[in-house]
Amino acid sequence: MDFTLDQKHEMARDLFKQFAETEVKPLAQETDETEVFPAETVAKMGKYGFMGIPVPKEYGGQGCDPLTYVMCVEELSKVCGTTGVIVSAHTSLCIDPIMTFGTEEQKKKYVPDLASGKKIGAFGLTEPGAGTDAQGCQTKAVLDGDEWVLNGSKCFITNGKVADVYIIIAITSITEDKRGRKKKNFSAFIVDKGTPGFSFGTKEKKMGIRGSSTYELIFEDARIPKDALLGKEGRGFPIAMHTLDGGRIGIAAQALGIAEGALERTIEYTKERKQFGRSIAQQQNTQFKLADMATRIDAAKYLVYAAAMKKAEFAKNPKVSYSVDAAKAKLFAAETAMAVTTECVQLRSEEHTSELQSPVPIS
């Protein structure tokens, strides 16, 4: 696989990096401390086209490949984890399933406003009793005439309260096989904010990424049109799994950016920090640690970029699967982010106790 970036990719990265440094980084600390969604920054990203990078131009997007999108999330996350995950959840978990499974009418209705950033997207699968066990979901949708009636709740939803468009997975029927074993049949729906019966519950208090709006979604006899069904009835689980494949690449890019940002800040610090008459960057023990972190980050980057390129192949040939590539990328990039940020805190010694000196882009 060729990892050489062409001129367009390099130019895109420069744009993302410049925006991150000038528009995102100065507000990152405040975003984390106040736990307020960075609405102005998101609006600016919409104007720059960051909210619809992989969306075809005919639907208002930039028409770029998955790798360009990954680089955007990566560069944003170097300075602010919050901003990176906002773009990731919006694009991978809301726009992508509409583009992949939606009707032409649904695409025209929702995608242009999502791609421009005029509207924000979210995805609701996780429930209090259904995390890794996605089939444990209890939220139900019952067809009543020309409307679906939703009842249930979702939790830990990124972009929760600020979103305008939600992809919701719910049970639409339960069937039995010849042995009497029951099977839940799920379907996917597009739900608009403001739908009667749709409200918000608990706002999650988090240790990091605190500017991201993470909320509980509550559905109490929420009625949505019959044509809000995304894809075919009973195909909600495959739709959710496909969506999560793309989501894993986005989160992998976020983790990669966080690790890179932490290492960059720590390298600067080690050059300034003096011990025993010289900077700690000149001490071999420090150099070993920095080298190990840089190596892990490069390995993670190759996995993340490879997954993005595999997703691009899928767009041309649906028989190509990128599920394993996405899972590997998320696993290794997330573990790398944890390992690198932990080591960076150790190198910063007592300095890490000051929020203003944090080496980790936790916002």
Regions found by a protein language model. Give the residues of each.
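Alpha-helical interface subdomain recognition
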Residues: 1-89, 101-106, 113-118, 131-137, ...
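Short Gly/Pro-enriched turn/cap motifs at secondary-structure boundaries
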Residues: 129-132, 156-159, 179-181, 206-213
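A short, Trp-centered hydrophobic/proline-enriched beta-strand micro-motif
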Residues: 117-125, 169
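Long, acidic (Asp/Glu-rich), low-complexity accessory segments flanking structured domains
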Residues: 220-239
